[in-house]
């Protein structure tokens, strides 16, 4: 079973249109990351690659369109 560290609103993530990743600072010093396509496919968990903590991304599917417009 997954253990979710926190729930974070999508507006609190930074979006990089080049990598198409949403990122958010992790307590370990690295960053949680999830791709816009994963979110669009219904995957709402961002994982830190360094410490494996996970956060749930809170968003509505229509929120993603403004980010797709940046790509």
From Swiss-Prot:
- The disulfide bonds in this chain are none
Highest taxon of the source? Eukaryota
A Pfam entry, by short name: Zn_ribbon_CSL
Decide whether keyword Iron is in the record: yes
Instruction: Spell out the SUPFAM superfamilies in the cross-references.
Output: CSL zinc finger
Xref: InterPro entries: DPH3/4-like, DPH_MB_dom, DPH_MB_sf
Q: The DPH-type MB domain covers which part of the protein?
A: 4-60
Q: In which pathway does it act?
A: Protein modification; peptidyl-diphthamide biosynthesis
* Major localisation: cytoplasm
Subcellular location(s): the record lists:
Cytoplasm; Nucleus
MF annotations from Gene Ontology: ferrous iron binding; iron chaperone activity; oxidoreductase activity
| Cellular component GO terms held in the UniProt record | cytoplasm; nucleus
Q: Which cofactor does it need?
A: Fe(2+)
Question: Which annotated residues bind Fe cation?
Answer: 26, 28, 48, 51
- Assigned keywords, A-Z: Cytoplasm, Iron, Metal-binding, Nucleus, Oxidoreductase
**What Gene3D superfamilies does the database record attribute to this sequence?**
DPH Zinc finger
Q: What does the record give as the function of this protein?
A: Required for the first step of diphthamide biosynthesis, a post-translational modification of histidine which occurs in elongation factor 2. DPH1 and DPH2 transfer a 3-amino-3-carboxypropyl (ACP) group from S-adenosyl-L-methionine (SAM) to a histidine residue, the reaction is assisted by a reduction system comprising KTI11/DPH3 and a NADH-dependent reductase, predominantly CBR1. Acts as an electron donor to reduce the Fe-S cluster in DPH1-DPH2 keeping the [4Fe-4S] clusters in the active and reduced state.
Subunit-structure text: Component of the 2-(3-amino-3-carboxypropyl)histidine synthase complex composed of DPH1, DPH2, DPH3 and a NADH-dependent reductase, predominantly CBR1.
**Name of the protein:** Diphthamide biosynthesis protein 3
């Amino acid at each position: 079973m997954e253990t979710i560290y926190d729930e974070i609103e999508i507006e609190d993530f930074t979006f990089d249109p080049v990598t198409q990743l949403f990122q958010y600072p992790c307590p370990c010093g690295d960053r949680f990351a999830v791709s816009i396509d994963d979110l669009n496919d219904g995957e709402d968990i961002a994982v830190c690659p360094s410490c494996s903590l996970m956060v749930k991304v809170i968003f509505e599917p229509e929120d993603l369109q403004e980010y797709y417009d940046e790509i």
